[in-house]
Amino acid sequence: MQQKNYQQEILALIHSGLPQAELAEKLSDYHENDLADALAALTPDERQKLYAVLGVDTVAEIFSYLDDAEPYLKELPSEKAANVVSHMDSDDAVDALDDLEEEDKAKIVGQLDKDSAEDVKMLLSYGEDEIGSSMTTNYICIRKDMTIRQAMSELVKQAGENDNISTLYVVDENDKFYGAIDLKDLIIARAEDSLEKLIARSYPYVTDHEKISDCIDRIVDYAERSLPVLNDAGELVGIITSADVVELVDDEMGDDYAKLGGLTSEEDLNEGVFESVKKRLPWLVALLFLGMLVSSVVGAFESVVAVLPIVICFQSMVLDMAGNVGTQSLAVTIRVLVDENLTTSKKLHLLWKEMRVGLVNGALLAVMALGFLGCYIHFFKAYVWGQAFLLSGCVGVSLIVAMVISSLVGTIIPMLFHKIHIDPAVASGPLITTINDLVAVVVYYGLAMIVLIDMLHLG
């Protein structure tokens, strides 16, 4: 069944001229994410009228689904913008405010109600790479000395202002995290039962200053709807929800993907040309000098090209295959290094495995190169069969050696970066590819010079 696009329906309703009450009722059937998608197709005046129809609670939900809330918040007077932000979950509010200039952000934060301002300021105090910056303060909290009846009463009292009610978090008399209760267990419990029996004391948690990259896999492994976030004193300061986890995983993947290209994860469509150039140029300068080194090595084999010009036809193939293999090994290694419990023996096993994979792939490609390139050189370059297969054999052996070494380089470099506490994703694709180009050039032209020219006197 084809996925339905509701945007056109929503726009048609908005432009239909229905009375406000009827329009609000019909729009309430649509998810806030679909309503958010429709905002860009409206004029500023139409958006203002829509906000008035929907009410601040719904508008706050819609804003939480926007990828970039800045242009929409700036359309609102600061007082109205603050009202919308105060009705958003704290983590969504911080995401929306992060898109604003510091002056606009401070103006809105200054007009938030006391509780919202405290939550937002707390989340803004964390670094972008810390769990605390992505948590929400929207959760149910009860004390461990309550009865079942009191806990149910507290749940009903807090549920009106909190969406995350599937798990109740329990604190002791000192406000320290004590455990968690599943909502289902509380609902089916008898009034005379002890609340203590329902509390999961060994409930998993994360700490507010933990790096997102260090604990994201652990959060995913628990597969809970939410996890508590504790400070250094063991106090409950927020929770990480499953929706937050999806965003964090997506951000981490985007971050690693950018680093594999030698970029930064912050670059986007709204960033200026100068800022993008400033972020990319250092990598490109470093790679320029490495490229010059590769070129100088190629220049050292001018005599080989002069005697046997055909070898230059297959240079790019050997270099590309070496680079591809190195990048594959890099991607596998970065994924494995996420496991903080990875032992030295497992790292050596990975290194040995990647080299064997490179060897097997290289051998298979070498056989193909021997046959196909041999025929190509004979029929299209007019070499006799013997010389044609000697040349294709040299290419094949070069592929084997270059691919094994490239597998080694693509595995060992991120391991070294990880050892010295540098993000292994920084050992990016361009760097690995350039190093492997250097290795492949030396192997290919070295074999051609030693075997084909010095030993067999071809050319």
Q: What name fits each language-model region?
A:
Residues 32, 145, 149, 209, ...:
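Electropositive phosphate-/nucleotide-binding environments in soluble metabolic enzymes
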Residues 255-408, 412-424, 434-435, 447-459:
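Alpha-helical transmembrane segments and their membrane-interface boundaries
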Residues 238, 433-444:
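Alpha-helical transmembrane segments that form the membrane-embedded catalytic/substrate-binding core
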Residues 6, 12, 17-18, 24-25, ...:
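Short leucine-rich amphipathic alpha-helices used at interfaces
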Residues 1-260:
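Hydrophobic packing positions in regular secondary-structure scaffolds
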